[in-house]
């Protein structure tokens, strides 16, 4: 299983003092050198952490894969086509939220989704949708022309009772299997950490996990290299 590192909260820390450090681009380079298969950043409409210049510099420096998380807006579509990350991930976005709170509402947005996706894919950029692990959402993602679905693991990360955890893993596994059978690649993310990641090793359809807050929190104390290698050990060797 591969690991994509979300470096948004490096920018959050930098912006807390309106300084130049820590630098998300430097953090991304260390993550790549430590074994990360990709770098994820979310250019939010309010620019609360990653800024436009960060995205430009990341595009110039990332050597693995750059995944731009973004809202489904004309502005973000233009930015994506101009900067050409390897991949965009469409996510829901609310200004008042601390972090993304749920999967992309593909049912409500379906009528304009295929039209939005086509010029992005025509520019040579793959498209992923951050969705709830439900068969209907998977089917609509495939029909709209997505390449990848990212299973929203937030609800799983909040479960405490073993039976609830098992039920959520089963739900994710079923959706992931359906997605792969539908011709989609499957990744997973949101709320995953060093303590709840192990069950995902048993879901063979999931090729990559995307981890941000937990990994950056460990990096703040132990360093980015250690944080990345510790996670890679858990998902591949434990």
UniProtKB/Swiss-Prot annotation:
Localization per record: Cytoplasm
Record's keyword annotation contains Membrane: no
SUPFAM superfamilies named in the record: Pyridoxine 5'-phosphate synthase
Recorded GO CC terms: cytosol
One Pfam family matching this protein: PdxJ
EC number(s) per entry: 2.6.99.2
Chain positions recorded as 3-amino-2-oxopropyl phosphate binding sites: 6, 17, 191, 212-213
Main subcellular location: cytoplasm
Pathway per the UniProt entry: Cofactor biosynthesis; pyridoxine 5'-phosphate biosynthesis; pyridoxine 5'-phosphate from D-erythrose 4-phosphate: step 5/5
Catalytic activity: 3-amino-2-oxopropyl phosphate + 1-deoxy-D-xylulose 5-phosphate = pyridoxine 5'-phosphate + phosphate + 2 H2O + H(+)
Residues annotated as catalytic: 42, 69, 190
Organism superkingdom: Bacteria
Gene Ontology biological process terms in this record: pyridoxine biosynthetic process
EC supergroup of this enzyme: transferase
Family matches, as InterPro entries: Aldolase_TIM, PyrdxlP_synth_PdxJ, Pyridoxine-5'_phos_synth
CDD domains in UniProt: PNPsynthase (cd00003)
Residues holding 1-deoxy-D-xylulose 5-phosphate: 8-9, 44, 49, 99
Residues at the site labelled Transition state stabilizer: 150
Keywords: Cytoplasm, Pyridoxine biosynthesis, Transferase
GO molecular function per UniProt: pyridoxine 5'-phosphate synthase activity
NCBIfam families associated with the record: pdxJ (TIGR00559), PRK05265.1-3 (NF003625), PRK05265.1-5 (NF003627)
Function summary: Catalyzes the complicated ring closure reaction between the two acyclic compounds 1-deoxy-D-xylulose-5-phosphate (DXP) and 3-amino-2-oxopropyl phosphate (1-amino-acetone-3-phosphate or AAP) to form pyridoxine 5'-phosphate (PNP) and inorganic phosphate.
Alphabetized PANTHER family for the sequence: PYRIDOXINE 5'-PHOSPHATE SYNTHASE (PTHR30456:SF0)
Quaternary structure and interacting proteins, as annotated: Homooctamer; tetramer of dimers.
Family, per entry: Belongs to the PNP synthase family.
Protein name: Pyridoxine 5'-phosphate synthase
Source organism of this protein record: Chlorobium phaeobacteroides (strain BS1)
